[in-house]
Every structure is written in structure tokens, then in C-alpha cells.
Amino acid sequence: MMDTRTLPYREPQHIEELTIREGLEGLSPARIATLYRRAPLLRPVDNPKKLWEMFERSSLVLTAWNDGNLVGIARVLTDGGLYSYLCDLAVEPDVQRLGVGKKLIDEVLKRCKGTDLMLRDSDISAGFYAHLGFQRVENAWVGRAR
């Protein structure tokens, strides 16, 4: 069972050889699904076609690699002028709290400069985003297109 309490943020250690890449190179639906299951992110991992379409339609996909292994993904939609939305941030559990998520967020912020970066968090990730300087807002609504 997943702990739903807010966890205190702890300063991470760091991975020495972390490479950030932009784009879909090295990715496949199976590779993404494996990371998302392990992270865990609730996404359509059992529907490879839909999962791949999500990535192809994204404005920005950043991947983090360590020794040739995929250890993190950030996926963003943006209008390029006002808002960017961080759809996904997934980090391999074995390297969480080692600076991978922070490095991905730093790179997203560089590439989405001049826009407000919005995201949905969970109770577990709230401390991470607060530590990075994100502010919780109450005036947001979520609807689902049917």
C-alpha cells in the first residue's frame, strides 16, 4: 500500500553521470511503461498505442539516463507564451532522491522560460515541489472531456 502522507523533503545525493536528452530517442512504449509502473505513475501503460501518442503529441519530452539506463522522464505541454503543464515526472525508484527529478525540472524550466509551469502533485511529491520553489494554488479546476 502506498503511503499517502506528505513526506518531508530531504536533500538528495547525486548521480555523477546523468545525461539529459530531449526527444523520443531511445524510448519505446514498453520502456516508458516499465518506468511508469515502477515510479509509479497512473497512466495508460497497458495501452502502448495511447501511451506513445501521448509522447508524440507532447511539446517537450526530456529523458534522464545513467550508464545507458533510462532513469527519468519529464513530459510537458506548452503554448510557448504563457503556460506550460508538466504532465509527467517519473523517476526510477532506485535513484529517487539522487537529484534526477530536480535536474529534469531544472531543464524543463530552462526550456519553458517565460511561462508559468503548472502541474498536479500527490501528497508524496508535494514536499519535493515546495522545496523547488513551486507554490500551491487553490484556483484551479480539472474537468474531463468525454
Predicted regions, residues:
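Short amphipathic alpha-helix that is part of the acyltransferase structural core
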Residues: M2-P48, A140
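Conserved catalytic-core motifs of GNAT/GCN5-like acyltransferases
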Residues: D3-P8, M118-R120, A130, Q135-R146
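Conserved acetyl-CoA-binding loop-helix of GNAT-fold acetyltransferases
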Residues: V91, R97-K110
